[in-house]
Amino acid sequence: MTETVWYASYGSNMHLSRLRCYLAGGTPDGGAITLPGCRHRAGPLRSVPLTLPGLQYFATESLTWTGGRAFYDPDASGETAARAHLVTIDQFCDIAAQEMYRTPGTDLDLREAITHGRSTLGPGRYETLVCTGTFEGHPVLTITAPWRYTDLPGNPPSAAYIHHLAAGLTESHAWTVEEIANYIATRPGAELGWTATTIAAVLGQATRIDAETIAPSRTT
């Protein structure tokens, strides 16, 4: 089996600085939980934008961000914007462990997911592995829940979580604030607390603050 796989992130791990907390350990901006990191702490070999068949949605309650978590329903109609990171197999296994608040270090058998497209490690929210195919000779794997997006109530994401989603979509797909706001607002669960207008306002305000922070000081 290949020694590297594409980890297809569709949530906050699209944002590279957020992913680094999973790889090297640390607490993400706006997060409440410190992650231990992977056995192999190097960054991804490559990161590329991808579009997955299926639907992103928000449900349950995140201990890290509060608000809804992002999940992926591969059986629903639609498309999901993602960012694939080329990582080692042990890194992928350790990311999966941390998604379930477990101690990393246990290798997973990925053969069923790679061969048959899906495998279930357990009943937990991030214990279903989905292989959407291959890209440049490496399997594309992602992590999600066993249920359909219609199986449980939606829960809108927090503003902090939206900031990481937006940063990841900007880095990978080069989307504008308007494109990001329209995309997130139309994911099931998000509409319970957000509109495209309110998301754009939050992201626009953050962009202005960032610009002011990095602007060179003027002397008189």
Residue ranges and their predicted role:
Residues T2-T220:
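Glycine-aromatic micro-motifs
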